[in-house]
A protein has these predicted regions:
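Conserved nucleotide-sugar phosphate-binding/catalytic loop shared by glycosyltransferases and other
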Residues: 4-49, 56
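A nucleotide-sugar donor-handling region in carbohydrate enzymes
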Residues: 11-17, 117-192
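Active-site and donor-binding regions of nucleotide-sugar-utilizing enzymes
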Residues: 36-138
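A donor-sugar binding/catalytic signature common to diverse glycosyltransferases
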Residues: 71-72, 79-82, 94, 120, ...
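Short hydrophobic signal-anchor/transmembrane segments that target glycosyltransferases
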Residues: 192-207
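Catalytic donor nucleotide-activated moiety binding site of glycosyltransferases and closely related
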Residues: 207-243
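Nucleotide-sugar donor-binding patch of glycosyltransferase catalytic domains
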Residues: 271-317
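C-terminal amphipathic helix plus adjacent low-complexity
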Residues: 305, 309-335
Length: 335
């Protein structure tokens, strides 16, 4: 198999850390870049970004002429890229179809991608069954697990000292890794839920260090960022990062006492590291979760109580329903 790589979306945006540089640092040659000009998270700007992605991916496919497109997940950019593949009669292999996230429009995008795809590389048997119920032929459906877990086997994570050097700050006696993304199906895009999370974090002792990553480019992200900056300014117990990159992020996850917020990484990667997760609100509602995941409503008192429970949990040996970290081999075999 010959890899041709198209990079688009937040990977090319300065405010999200220009993470295309990390792709290149890992030794991958980038064949095409499709900048989207993400001016804001307003629906009109995102619609224009999708149009640019459709046009740019179409042009890239015309030049590259691949035999197949491989795409992961449920981002709106991927939906546009998949439409371009359809028009160019390029078969689509889709990773992570059949998963559930009831609180986000990602749910609709993911299922739309399933109907555009020709091969379905699902994370769990439950997801595979859901894809089959959508009418997809059994021979097209393959359970491969979550590719994100492969990196936990392949990366040499930083130890505490090296991580502190890489972060430019010392870990606390207790540490939380916090991420909040917009909840796109809620009227306020999840802003009230984020404010409840901040109130819950406020109630914790100051010796609990909060390591916070900024939200994604979904509608409502700018409002979440503004609330975060207003709350975090001048606080010695808070560190905020646009992007930690894969190595620092997973290394930090392995060192913290709990993962808190509504990111899928708390359900996908954290269980494999033996780290408890406090999943706040409805963004991940319906998604299969390990025993190390505590679901709680977006209410300050409930969040504080859930964090308290998490800090007392022993999650060593928890079974991760998303696989064993050997997804890449299975995917390549299917392709």
């Amino acid at each position: 198999l010959e890899l041709q790589l198209i990079v688009t979306g937040a990977h090319l945006e300065p405010r999200f850390g220009i993470t295309v540089q990390q792709i290149e640092a890992d030794g991958f040659a980038i064949d095409e870049r499709v900048p989207l000009g993400l001016e804001s998270d307003a629906p009109g700007d995102l619609a224009r970004a999708m149009a640019r992605c459709l046009e740019g991916t179409s042009e890239a496919l015309g030049r590259l002429r691949p035999d197949l497109m491989l795409a992961l997940g449920d981002r709106y950019e991927i939906l546009a890229a998949a439409q371009a593949a359809m028009l160019h009669r390029v078969p689509l292999a889709h990773i992570a179809g059949g998963d559930i996230t009831e609180g986000a429009f990602d749910e609709s995008i993911r299922h739309a991608l399933t109907k555009l795809a020709h091969l379905h590389l699902t994370t769990t048997a439950e997801a595979a069954a859901r894809v089959a119920r959508m009418g997809e032929e059994p021979w097209r459906i393959h359970v491969v697990g979550s590719p994100g877990l492969d990196q936990l086997r392949r990366l040499e994570l930083l130890d505490r000292t090296a991580l502190e050097d890489a972060l430019g700050a010392s870990l606390g006696s207790r540490n939380l890794l916090v991420t909040w993304h917009p909840v796109t199906l809620e009227a306020d895009r999840g802003l009230a839920g984020f404010e409840a999370l901040l109130a819950g974090l406020d109630a914790l002792p100051r010796e609990v260090a909060k390591w916070i990553t900024r939200p994604n480019a979904d509608p409502g992200g700018a409002a979440v960022e503004a609330a975060l900056d207003a709350w975090a300014g001048g606080r010695e117990d808070v560190r905020v990062f646009a992007s930690l990159g894969q190595l620092r992020y997973l290394s930090l996850m392995a060192q913290v006492d709990a993962v808190v917020g509504n990111s899928s990484s708390g359900l996908y990667e954290a269980p494999s590291l033996g780290v408890p997760t406090v999943d706040v609100g409805d963004r991940q509602k319906g998604r299969l979760a390990a025993a190390s995941v505590i679901h709680c409503p977006a209410e300050p008192t409930a969040i504080v109580a859930a964090i308290g429970r998490a800090l007392e949990m022993d999650c060593a040996g928890v079974e991760n329903p998303y696989g064993d970290g050997d997804s890449a081999r299975r995917i390549v075999e299917v392709l």
